[in-house]
Amino acid sequence: MSKIPLVIKLGGAVLSCNDTLEKLFTAISAYQASAQRPLLLVHGGGYLVDDLMKKLQLETIKKEGLRVTPKAQIPFIAGALAGTANKMLQGRAIKSGVAAVGLSLADGGLCQITELDPELGSVGKAAPGNGALVSQIMASGYLPIVSSIGLDANGELMNVNADQAAVAVAAALDAELVLLSDVSGVLDGKGHLISALTEQQAEDLITQAVITDGMIVKVRAAIEAAKALGRPIEVATWRYPDKLAALFDGQNIGTKFSSS
């Protein structure tokens, strides 16, 4: 049984599906009862932000799959991600019997955040920081649930792409990483799951427009994760909760990425 921590990034529509969340946290609860491997969740919550922007009559703009975040909007986005989404997930975990702690990228200096691109506004890039506090939390039997909101060196709120945040968190903890989303992994031109991809193979599929839009960010984050962590990482789906225990144990149920 591996004792290397496993970082699980939750994405897609899972945050809006109570039934799936219940099954996910039930699977985590059952796994933690019999395994000693520390688990940690990283999440975004784009749909919550989209809904909030509509209610506030603010336009949502994306550049290459990344949300443009004007400084005037970051308080609302941080509230949706570090507030509503994080506490909703924590509540679902507690309901399923999982002892959960809600955190952000800033807590304990887990990640260091710098501005990604001035054209994107308050959007940050996360680098691995100090994982000591989060490691202590996991060692005490808690499941950290980490939002993709961080603080830069000036204490300014920054919105970080959740896939990229998960990479930095995994690097800070020397952990393995799974990106869980509403897709099974990367599909070929005929809709069949590709079980493994190298960087060159992935870039070829991007050039061929087999991999498009937001999936480009996800795939490149996966490749960067494999490089940064020095180990393959996996993109898989949360749609089949009965497979999650196998995933937690390191079995491949999606697309596994390697740097070479």
UniProtKB/Swiss-Prot annotation:
Residues at the site labelled Transition state stabilizer: 9, 218
Entry's Gene Ontology cellular component terms: cytoplasm
Pfam families attached to this UniProt entry: AA_kinase
Signal peptide positions (record): none
Binding site for substrate: 45-46, 67, 159
Pathway: Amino-acid biosynthesis; L-arginine biosynthesis; N(2)-acetyl-L-ornithine from L-glutamate: step 2/4
Entry's EC annotation: 2.7.2.8
Catalytic activity: N-acetyl-L-glutamate + ATP = N-acetyl-L-glutamyl 5-phosphate + ADP
Entries under Gene3D superfamilies matching the protein: Acetylglutamate kinase-like
Protein location: Cytoplasm
Keywords: Amino-acid biosynthesis, Arginine biosynthesis, ATP-binding, Cytoplasm, Kinase, Nucleotide-binding, Transferase
UniProt record, GO biological process: arginine biosynthetic process via ornithine; L-arginine biosynthetic process
Keyword ATP-binding part of the UniProt annotation: yes
Top class in the EC scheme: transferase
GO molecular function: acetylglutamate kinase activity; ATP binding
InterPro entries linked to this entry: AceGlu_kinase-like_sf, AcgluKinase_fam, ArgB, Asp/Glu/Uridylate_kinase
Family designation: Belongs to the acetylglutamate kinase family. ArgB subfamily.
HAMAP family per the UniProt record, alphabetical: ArgB
Function, in words: Catalyzes the ATP-dependent phosphorylation of N-acetyl-L-glutamate.
Name of the protein this chain belongs to: Acetylglutamate kinase
Lineage of the species this protein comes from: Bacteria, Pseudomonadati, Pseudomonadota, Gammaproteobacteria, Vibrionales
Gene expressing this chain: argB
